[in-house]
Amino acid sequence: MTSCAISGHRPTRFKFGYKETHTGCKRLKRVMREQFDLLYQQGVREFYVGGALGVDMWAAEILLRMKEQSAYSDLLLHMVLPFAGHDENWDERSRERLRFIMRHCADTVVIGIPGQLPLACYKLRNQYLVDHADCLLAVYDSDRSIRSGTGQTVHYAQRRGLHPIILVHPDTSDVCCLLK
């Protein structure tokens, strides 16, 4: 196992919304960091994130901070964007955060082509993440019956046989691992 895809909800899904100083957000980020460390100890060196607000951005920032430490210097972060300009309706601070991540990651892949429907691009982006990974870490509530890109990504990873599939609950930050 050498690579991990990351998926998760956008801030509007979380009880704390965009408030990253909220204890729930801090706890979630801490648990994500702990899981990345465990994956690294198991040989994972490449991480794939999708470039969305929320979990994707937080994961990328956590991983870049880890990479600054000599113990994680061989860590590689890959940014996979659904289409060029997917961030055009974001606030400037969020767009700058994305540009910073893109400048510091190993590479950026843009999935969609001009004229392609955005929804199709998001689905193809999620498939790309899974297709390039050995395991998946998803911030996802499997008990809620909401339709989401994260849910689709988890189910696609199950069909593809990724293992482990690590689920971090978006409200409690509890961690569970789906069995094959």
Task: Locate the predicted segments by residue.
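Acidic/glycine-enriched connector segments
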Residues: M1-L179
